[in-house]
Amino acid sequence: MKINVLAFGVAKEIFGSSLVSLELTNDATIYNLKYLLEQQYPRLKQLASYMVAVNNEYALPGDTIHERDEIAIIPPVSGG
Amino acid sequence: MIFGIKDYWSKDKWTKESLIFDLFVLDQLINDMTNTQILLSAETLNIQSCIDWVMSPESGGIDVFIGTVRNATKGKAVLKLDFEAYEPMAVTEMEKIVQQAFDKWPVQRVLIHHRTGVLQVGEVPVIIAVSAAHRDAAFDACRYIIDTLKQTVPIWKKEAFEDGDIWVAAHP
């Protein structure tokens, strides 16, 4: 399945775009997504940490991704 | 929320007692809808209007946290900050924090206003205002809200220095 990944903050600069498209297997997890992204964008591994959000909620590494989910890369937050 | 409006109107037995109870519940529902205000804005925040909004005759005190753009980080001059938000999720996460504050402390009204966009030194990126009958709850909730916001709400700031820009907290 093809999914779109939103990027914010430093992740947007690492991807060179606020939106990237990826091809994932149908039962892909957050862990699989992070692995794939880190292969394509090694600078992600240099971040202090980063989370993935699915449909506006923080996701866990074992969570499955579904087609049409809204996926976002959340680098360390620094609001306030 | 105890029950939805649909359930409310489909009640088939109307007694004086149940009506009084229902009006009480409805009042609570309306109150629930107006005791929280969350705003993400690209416009200048208005401190006085935030204080006015949380003030009520039942309040014994108001706690306000105002974040301001500092002119230096670790001795290096900061020229400006640029705030970016994942807006729908930022609002959802702020709503969660406010709900946690209501669960933990007897607070009356809670407000969070947060800026997006470019802010100059001295400008205000965030205002948190909390009213309560007694000051302990207001102090504790206000502190909890700003501390948790900084950990969980998807908002990012980029510091502009004379020799380049850095996303805060991005790298170890």
Q: Can you say where each PLM-predicted feature lies in the sequence?
A:
Chain A
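Ubiquitin-like/PB1-type beta-grasp interaction modules and other compact soluble beta-rich domains
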Residues: 1-78
